[in-house]
Curated annotation (Swiss-Prot):
Belongs to the TBP family. HAMAP family: TATA_bind_prot_arch. It comes from the Eukaryota. It comes from Protobothrops flavoviridis (Habu). One of its GO terms (biological process) is transcription by RNA polymerase III. Keywords: DNA-binding, Nucleus, Repeat, Transcription. Sequence repeats lie at residues 126-202, 216-293. GO terms for cellular component: nucleus; transcription factor TFIID complex. GO terms for molecular function: DNA binding; RNA polymerase III general transcription initiation factor activity. PROSITE patterns: TFIID. This is TATA-box-binding protein. The keyword DNA-binding applies. CDD domains: TBP_eukaryotes (cd04516). General transcription factor that functions at the core of the DNA-binding multiprotein factor TFIID. Binding of TFIID to the TATA box is the initial transcriptional step of the pre-initiation complex (PIC), playing a role in the activation of eukaryotic genes transcribed by RNA polymerase II.
């Protein structure tokens, strides 16, 4: 027993664990899981963390109840602000321009440089009216040419009788099929009157002529805008509607879409309008082109 109690000095520390244990270092046990004693432990326990989280949650709930029970008075132009809601402002900030104009704000209309509603005060004059009529019977053109006055017929040059009258001053083309074309009248009434006179001449020559399907096929008008026009600038700006070849023809050809009218525009300011079926199309086309011509007026 004395030999067991007497241990060498180097083994005395191992025999007494309490004297060999360093403060702050845990005691290792063979049954302890590997790495348990090596993991540093936090200085604060989990009980203290849960207490702090519970206090923060209680403070947030108290603040939410206070904000919902006492809503703040919203200023003018703003909606009441609730907890975790975004403020919606309808009034613009000072010194900024609102994105959408107010419906009560008066809006200034944009005036075009050459308004289409501007009246020119110029009325185009009708220069020629082309009309057609059907006499309703076959005609012997040689007989008409020999027996009628002021009639000529040359079948090698043109297969129709050319007849003229003085009042109204017009010319008729009479075909063997009974169709007739009347040109040269200055108004719709004159064109109809002239066509009836030609039909009466044919009747007197012994043909059963009638007066069927009278129709105006074309009207030609002209006017003067009283100022020179820059045709080069006009054709560049309106090149999809116009063509200008001064070496071939001195006028600019402008093909209007609505109404379907063709205009011949000259540098002197003279304008010729053709292709109309009624008189109103001539007037409408000129009122449409006049602001454009005014925009290309020569200054010198």
């Amino acid at each position: 027993m004395d030999q067991n109690n007497s241990l060498p000095p180097y083994a005395q520390g191992l025999a007494s664990p309490q004297s060999a244990m360093t403060p702050g270092i845990p005691i290792f046990s063979p049954m302890m899981p590997y790495g348990t004693g090596l993991t540093p432990q936090p200085a604060q326990s989990t009980n203290s963390l849960s207490i702090l989280e519970e206090q923060q949650r209680q403070q947030q709930q108290a603040a939410a109840q206070q904000s919902t029970s006492q809503p703040t008075q919203a200023p003018s132009g703003q909606t009441p602000q609730l907890f975790h809601s975004q403020t919606l402002t309808t009034a613009p900030l000072p010194g900024t321009t609102p994105l959408y104009p107010s419906p009560m704000t008066p809006m200034t209309p944009i005036t075009p440089a050459t308004p289409a509603s501007e009246s020119s005060g110029i009325v185009p004059q009708l220069q020629n009216i082309v009309s057609t009529v059907n006499l309703g019977c076959k005609l012997d053109l040689k007989t008409i040419a020999l027996r009628a006055r002021n009639a000529e017929y040359n079948p090698k040059r043109f297969a129709a009788v050319i007849m003229r009258i003085r009042e109204p001053r017009t010319t008729a083309l009479i075909f063997s099929s009974g169709k007739m074309v009347c040109t040269g009248a200055k108004s719709e009434e004159q064109s109809r009157l002239a066509a009836r006179k030609y039909a009466r001449v044919v009747q007197k020559l012994g043909f059963p002529a009638k007066f069927l399907d009278f129709k105006i096929q074309n009207m030609v008008g002209s006017c003067d805008v009283k100022f020179p026009i820059r045709l080069e600038g006009l054709v560049l700006t309106h090149q999809q509607f116009s063509s200008y070849e001064p070496e071939l023809f001195p006028g600019l050809i402008y093909r209007m879409i609505k109404p379907r009218i063709v205009l011949l525009i000259f540098v002197s300011g003279k304008v010729v309008l053709t292709g109309a079926k009624v008189r109103g199309e001539i007037y409408e086309a000129f009122e449409n082109i006049y602001p454009i011509l005014k925009g290309f007026r020569k200054t010198t």
